[in-house]
């Protein structure tokens, strides 16, 4: 059963809130040893941040590697039920006997959908593509992305009641477009709850000196992932936003918000690795290209040190120890001017680049949307596992591999709570 709201109260069921890699892993580990699991995801599809990556560690695989296998496991497991476009409104009760109120937003497309795409073909209205961080537009009738699970289109609520919405309905040969779809509220009974709502990129506009949102060719590390992806806004071409020019000279600014008492006081763990990885994107796209990484300290824990050494051997990748003071734009060329003090030489540097990538930090989703129940947090709004368990990046900054590992352990804890 998927995306259905007729759920009977079940004693011993585990609720996983968040359908990213951590939530999916927790759900599968519990379900595959015989426990019933509900997955609740606020977006139209499962997959989370991993689905937005071009490649991920440790093997630099595309996200289709891990996600497709996990989606197949979910589809084949009768003990997993998922609810997309759904949020937790309220949690009552305690371990062993939770009553959870859910709200499901309308999708306006029912289970008859075959992903033929005729609704999108008929829709003339476009909206910003949030999957690509607004770097392009998509039709208001859309599949979230090519790997989306479930494979079902969505009609954006902004066009409901318009001619564009009616055109979508008229174009569908399977009677799958339901413009009368409504918000649904319902309750489920569960024995344990795992919060796995992940992270959000830190808002780069809060760092005024780095000029994100003011200088067009300054982007974030997650935007860089989408640029490099074959299903991204440029189909994987390394071009800059202002004019579509191929990028041959790029800079990466580390700790953009992280390790800063005015923003995120903690290290976000993956930012250095992400920038090292992204230098390979630009270098592979153009062997003549050059990349510079501005850093405070480079942190590559465990086996990732080997990857750092490999990147460092590339003569076209430079490393400058120093905190970037200012980023400006050359109005004539749209190039980006970076001002930084080189900590090792003591010299002030002003360098020109075609594009700059900010390594923005990880902010737990609970920094903005709290758990509507009895949850505990640390001083940075990460969830401390207690009555309500937590896993993945809502618990601490993590990479994909460690997120999967902690999710397995969390599944065991959830099972122990059920069996008390």
What are these regions (language model features)?
Residues 1-420:
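Residues forming the flavin
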